[in-house]
Amino acid sequence: SYQDFIPEIDLYERPTDYEENGNYVFVGVRQCGKSYMLYQRIQRLLHEGHDIREIVYVNFDDERLKMMKAEELDLILQAYAAMNEGKPLLFFDEIQNVDGWEHFARRLANQKYRVFITGSNAKMLGRDIATTLGGRYWTRNVYPFTFKEFLGSKGVLTLQTEKSGEVADLQWMHSPRVRAAVERAFNDYFHFGGFPELRNIVAKRIWLNDIYNKIFFSDLVVRNKVRNDNALRLTIRRLAECVRQPTAYNRISNLVQSTGVTC
């Protein structure tokens, strides 16, 4: 079944607080680690004594579920009830692929199910979620790794737990070997960013280019019905070149028009 592989996943745990009976939606850019937040929560629940049979994890990116309709979502609950007693803990990955999913999600909250959902920013922006789910879910924004998390995920810095919380072991400052490892990690982080998946990818630039194109076309062009994607692409490039510098709209407009692209 879907969830059988989750206990075996080697995760870098990211700190997140949960209300005991809260329902949660994790939103963020593609490949920022939203699914891993679900895996992390499932592993924590299993560690606390929950049985794997209490967990229902469904990945709606699965091609076998591409044609699923909102009225068929209740089949998940019916199938669970046929095999188990009690209410399951529900984990739905990329549920926004099912049109009308929000009605099902609201009903689950009203019926006191524990639900954890992920969705891409393309269809599940934070401001949309508040309206769509009627305040029944907590929203958690997920971002790529910070540099501290990046170091931790690569095992470069050890962390020691004290009564005051987690603090970095500063002994690395006196170790040339570890210091060199930190500098190499920073160079990697500076050039490629903190997407968790990049840790295991050799062709990082190709992977990033693929993610950029998916975000550009699916999350920007299609979502906002942009008619001139070339003008948008040039605008993004100009803004990326002017990080931390004021940029006038007229300057961008003139730049785009000078290339023969009409806004």
Locations of regions flagged by a protein language model:
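Hydrophobic anchor at the beta1->P-loop junction of P-loop NTPases
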Residues: 26
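Interdomain hinge/linker elements that couple catalytic modules in large macromolecular machines
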Residues: 157-263
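Walker A (P-loop) phosphate-binding loop of P-loop NTPases
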Residues: 30-31
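Short regulatory helix/loop adjacent to the ATP-binding pocket of P-loop NTPases
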Residues: 123-139, 151-156
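Structural recognition of the conserved hydrophobic beta-strand(s) that form the central parallel beta-sheet
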Residues: 114-120, 141, 150
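N-terminal pre-Walker A segment at the start of P-loop NTPase domains
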Residues: 1-16
